[in-house]
C-alpha cells in the first residue's frame, strides 16, 4: 500500500519541507539543495572493506539561483531530512518534467529505519544539458507499507547523513 504525502507530513516523517505543494497523493516531492561533480573513481567490493566513495566538488548556483549542467552524471543532495518508519520502505522516482528535459535521478531503496538528508545520482542525458534552479522539485519519494514491521532498522554508513 502506498502512503499519501499528507500522512507522512502529519506523522513527522519529513522533518524539513520547503513548501506544502511538495505533498503528493502518492508520496512527497524532494527538492534540490546541492549539486556535486564526481572528481575521481570510487571502489566497491563485497564486504565494504575496500569501499571508497568517489570524491566530489560542490558546484555553485549563480546569483539568480540557477545552475547549468552539461551532459554527464552528478551527485545531488536533497533539502529534506527524511525518516523511514520501521513499517515502510521508500522508492524514489524522477519527476516527469525532469525526464522530459532529458535528465533522470537514480537512487537505492530507502530502507526501514533510515533517516538522513539523502543523496542521489543525477544523470543528464540531454546533449544540450539542463538548467536547474535551487530548490527545484526533482524526485518523488513513494512510501510503501511493509507486510510486517522490520525487526531491525537500517544501521549502515549513511544513516543520519548530511545533517
Q: What do these predicted regions represent?
A:
Residues 1-163:
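DUTPase catalytic domain/fold
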